[in-house]
Amino acid sequence: MNNEKRLPSLEKPWQKYLPKENLGIEVPNKSIYEYVRDNAQRVIDSTAIEYFGTKISYRSFLERIDRFADSLKAIGVKEGEYVSFLAVTFPETITALYALNKIGAIANFIDPRIDVEGIKQLILDAKSKVLFVLDFAYPKIKPILED
């Protein structure tokens, strides 16, 4: 067995699963927020998200991201910190992901279908200082908050 250190980032083992025409594509050195912000300018009034018939343009999406990022900073969320969400995927959670990425914080999305102990452990493992909970999931989080 070869004992030298092997770095997946250099070996790129995932490439064996990609179509050959995708292997030469260069990944931009940008955050996901920067990528969307920069590319949205070309299609600013086009639909970024459509959810149950409601369309959100890139312009509106970017404005929502900026407002959410400002709100997160206002409550003290800093770069490198985890923010947990007990939620399902809908426009607000997508906005939250990009807002957190904009300020350098990390999203910890938790599936509300898992059991209370699992939810508690995921929050503790991430050392989340902020937790967003959908109303239907509150009964699961209530015993954790009381603990």
Model region roles, listed by residue range:
Residues 1-2, 102-147:
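Structural core segment of the AMP-binding/adenylate-forming
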Residues 27-28, 33, 37, 45-90, ...:
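Conserved AMP-binding/adenylate-forming core of the ANL superfamily
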Residues 24-27, 60, 107-110:
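Short, flexible loop segments at the rims of nucleotide/cofactor-binding pockets, characterized by
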